[in-house]
Curated annotation (Swiss-Prot):
This is Small ribosomal subunit protein uS4c. A slightly longer form of the protein may be created by RNA editing; however this region of the cDNA has not yet been sequenced. It is found in: Plastid, Chloroplast. One of the primary rRNA binding proteins, it binds directly to 16S rRNA where it nucleates assembly of the body of the 30S subunit. With S5 and S12 plays an important role in translational accuracy. InterPro entries: Ribosomal_uS4 (IPR022801), Ribosomal_uS4_bac-type (IPR005709), Ribosomal_uS4_N (IPR001912), S4_RNA-bd (IPR002942), S4_RNA-bd_sf (IPR036986). NCBIfam families: PRK05327.1, rpsD_bact. It comes from Adiantum capillus-veneris. The lineage of its organism: Eukaryota, Viridiplantae, Streptophyta, Embryophyta, Tracheophyta.
Length: 197
């Protein structure tokens, strides 16, 4: 995990979190000047993407296949598909501290999309979708335990908080590459799956 560096969706932080042990290991890795193969670079990029969004290998392969069939740059379409997942939107809005926490909110039926309960974390949000919390005590308590973080909301989303303190999110438009918080070269992931997809 430490080798994959900063994963904002998994750790909930935007900054790298290294301990003394990690710094020591980094110094040892740099001192041994091994040549890293292209396969290793692609595999690491794939693992970073998969772990950040909390996907299984099969799910990521399915998203790559969908991105290949869609018009446009395969890498950018892949990131767009992953960023528009409901669990990621909830994380980006600050309703959950991590993507796994957002997934739990969705699976426990605390989230409404366009005033309907959605319990599928991989639900693909569309422009003009309204994301809110169910109006029941357990849903309010679940959200209170996940304090609304002070992170900036990306430009493709809008967050408004009512007088009662209930957050409501709006998807303005599809996400663009500049709004993605993850530092990754998505083309390496596409190249990794070039023979499988």
């Amino acid at each position: 995990m430490r080798r994959l560096k900063n994963l904002p969706g998994l750790t909930g932080t935007g900054k790298s979190n290294t301990s003394n042990l990690g710094e020591f290991r980094l110094a040892v890795d740099q001192s041994t000047s091994r040549k890293i193969s292209q396969f290793c670079v692609r595999l690491e990029a794939k693992q970073r993407l998969r772990l950040n969004y909390g996907l299984t290998e099969r799910q990521l392969l399915r998203y790559v296949r969908i991105a290949r069939r869609t018009r446009g740059s395969t890498g950018q379409v892949l990131l767009q598909l992953l960023e528009m997942r409901l669990d990621n939107i909830i994380f980006q809005l600050g309703m959950a501290s991590t993507i796994p926490a957002a997934r739990q909110l969705v699976c426990h039926r605390h989230i409404l999309v366009n005033h309907r309960v959605v319990d599928i974390p991989s639900y693909r949000c569309k422009p003009r979708d309204i994301i809110s919390i169910r109006n029941r005590p357990t849903s309010a308590n679940a959200l209170k335990s996940e304090s609304l973080s002070g992170n900036e909301v990306p430009d493709h989303l809008t967050l408004s908080i009512s007088k009662t303190g209930e957050p409501t999110g709006l998807v303005n438009h599809l996400v663009n590459r500049e709004s993605v918080n993850l530092d990754i070269n998505e083309l390496l992931v596409v190249e990794y799956y070039s023979r499988k997809a």
